[in-house]
């Protein structure tokens, strides 16, 4: 198309409307018609040609909406986050945080990052997105829930130490949150999962048991109490098994007094544990020596 003002041919597809208001309306109309890719292009034009206009933040928001309409969820998250980073005055901040949270939940539910139809072998994007939601929310209504979900996502990725740290933040940062009880339980569960398999190092097992006991004491009405008690019993069994093997080790080394102490500890601390029976038998044998 020939333009007398510029005295040259211009591709109509590359042209921009005379004002940011008109350009935004044009992009919004394309979005409403579900012409998402075209809407994205027009939003980009507005941001490029009118970067300081008030409408630039709305263009960025509609670009994110259009990516979401195209089911490009990670790109949508990135575009939403740009509104927060570049246009902190935007009236859309609370709305954007909720949209980012929803995108994170989609990835938690199994959505994958893709290029075209090809799934990318990358870390679950929910981890990155939830970290941003927590940062963006500060002490907002979604903050503690996002913090809890971050812990759950890390736990599902078998990153138990990181998950445990994030769960603990729910209680320390948002002590009045409805998610504190669940987070305490999950933190204890993560501690039990990272307890070493070695029977000679029981510190993390003891710590996990202590956390479950604290949970039961502080949340006596919690729905998870029954499961927590079951996990305490399992950890007691594990602790007793470890003590039994340590006692047997000392006995083989002919350090009978040390062995006696560990056998007695099993009987005193967990008299109904499976390891208690052999511990009693061993003590009787040691009495004869």
Across the structure, where does each feature detected by a protein language model lie?
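Acidic, polar-rich low-complexity tracts and alpha-helical solenoid repeat scaffolds
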Residues: 1-289
């Amino acid at each position: 198309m020939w333009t007398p003002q510029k005295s040259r041919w211009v591709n109509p597809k590359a042209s921009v409307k005379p004002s940011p208001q008109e350009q935004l309306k044009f992009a919004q109309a394309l979005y409403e018609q579900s012409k998402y890719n075209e809407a994205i292009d027009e939003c980009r034009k507005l941001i490029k040609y009118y970067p300081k206009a008030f409408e630039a933040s709305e263009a960025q928001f509609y670009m994110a909406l259009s990516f979401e309409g195209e089911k490009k969820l990670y790109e949508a998250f990135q575009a939403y986050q740009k509104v927060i980073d570049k246009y902190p005055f935007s009236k859309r901040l609370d709305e954007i945080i909720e949209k980012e949270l929803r995108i994170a939940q989609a990835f938690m539910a199994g959505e994958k990052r893709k290029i075209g139809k090809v799934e990318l072998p990358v870390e679950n994007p929910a981890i990155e997105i939830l970290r941003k939601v927590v940062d963006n929310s500060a002490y907002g209504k979604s903050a503690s829930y996002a913090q809890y979900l971050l812990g759950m996502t890390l736990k599902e990725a078998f990153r138990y130490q990181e998950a445990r740290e994030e769960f603990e933040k729910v209680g320390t940062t948002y002590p009045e949150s409805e998610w504190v009880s669940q987070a305490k339980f999950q933190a204890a569960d993560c501690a039990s999962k990272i307890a070493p398999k070695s029977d000679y190092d029981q510190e993390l097992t003891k710590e996990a048991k202590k956390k479950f006991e604290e949970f039961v004491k502080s949340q006596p009405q919690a729905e998870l109490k029954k499961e927590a008690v079951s996990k305490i019993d399992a950890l007691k069994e594990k602790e007793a098994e470890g003590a039994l093997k340590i006692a047997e080790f000392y006995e083989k080394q002919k350090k009978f007094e040390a062995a006696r102490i560990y056998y007695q500890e099993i009987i005193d601390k967990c008299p109904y544990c499976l390891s208690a029976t052999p511990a009693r038998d061993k003590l009787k044998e040691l009495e004869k020596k």
